[in-house]
């Protein structure tokens, strides 16, 4: 199902902003992929990239066992941009010198720019950049010239304009580098001569055509959760093959308020899909009885989901393909050597090894914001496209500790109130994710003239662009006040509300 388009390769050296670099490139309507630094030059040539970007990373170029690239990558005739560690590695590999200075640079830094260079065309001679480095390039390789400096960094950027090889010590991909997107655009269009041929409208059209050709007259099965990713994947495949697609919606009893009914109404009635809803709440709760460890909960739910799904699939006769709503961050996080597993993904892995289906993952090239854009192109209701991210294990990981039906109901009702008030305040699309969870905490309160000892509800709301990092949302006090009063008054068994003001990192967005 490969679609021909101009390609930029982002070579991953383990930096924290690697996915952000890829997203910034795509914001210019240019397609890019992230590959590990271990990818051979031969494999890179086969991909026929029009430009290559080296990311940052935590290593020193002169350290033992540090990530390297083959020198031949610079001889492909493909424009190269090195960022931070990628800048240092470019200099080091081509004969320059990298040192560790006495004074390091972190944070906002003014950079002085030679805007006669194509890389900095149309950019001010002095502007704000974002630095985060310990080492620096002290001598540039032969054939290069310095095109930017800072007070502490003599080579903030360098260029071999004949070979179209560039390096920048700062991070153009972060918002704090005020000219970053302009500079990346210059590299893509003025240096590499790329066309902006990546759009969600063309993606959807091409993907529908490719799915039709791949599937032919065979049958396809989709595990539908009602979340954004699986919903967009299902509609995309349905547009291609219609009634050859059957969706199985496993209602594990861990959904938000009225969510199961909403999913059924949208996909069965509005889109006229073959939809099987399996009400398996009692089965899942039985398996989770007495379990409090979050990873154990995830694994039990994942395994039981597969069992239920397989049972339903077995009733349908011969099925040739399985649709998954895998998106690009899932692929990157599960497929590179440079990042650690934080939590097990519900959607990646976990499938039985002897699975008889071939996988269709129509969204595996897309970031979340691109998935939403495709959803809008396909005519999926705006409310569903902008539905809050919801983990596969559902409320099981928003009820901390052991799960009971009573705790689930408390969490559902509190969460529904929070979501309703956020919508009424017009904040739905300004906050990346918001939800109520039930910590395993009870506290003393006074309601009426009586002492109470009831549950605490924690509210969590974050701003983000990609969920890789996030900050806590500054919700107006009057909105929080109304949410708090409503939950305490309307949800039985709750006497205290707290608001989580932790960013990611150090915390994750979900509590479990």
Curated annotation (Swiss-Prot):
Positions with a binding annotation for ATP: 225-231
Sequence ranges assigned to domain Glutamine amidotransferase type-1 in this UniProt record: 7-197
Superkingdom to which the source organism belongs: Bacteria
EC number(s) per entry: 6.3.5.2
Pathway(s) of this molecule: Purine metabolism; GMP biosynthesis; GMP from XMP (L-Gln route): step 1/1
Catalytic center residues: 84 (nucleophile), 171, 173
Keywords: ATP-binding, Glutamine amidotransferase, GMP biosynthesis, Ligase, Nucleotide-binding, Purine biosynthesis
CDD domains assigned: GATase1_GMP_Synthase, GMP_synthase_C
Pfam family, one: GMP_synt_C
GO annotations of cellular component type: cytosol
Catalytic activity: XMP + L-glutamine + ATP + H2O = GMP + L-glutamate + AMP + diphosphate + 2 H(+)
Entry's Gene Ontology molecular function annotations: ATP binding; GMP synthase activity
Residues annotated as domain GMPS ATP-PPase: 198-387
Listed PANTHER family: GMP SYNTHASE [GLUTAMINE-HYDROLYZING] (PTHR11922:SF2), GMP SYNTHASE-RELATED (PTHR11922)
Assembly and oligomerization: Homodimer.
Chain's role: Catalyzes the synthesis of GMP from XMP.
Protein name as it appears in the record: GMP synthase [glutamine-hydrolyzing]
Organism (species): Clostridium novyi (strain NT)
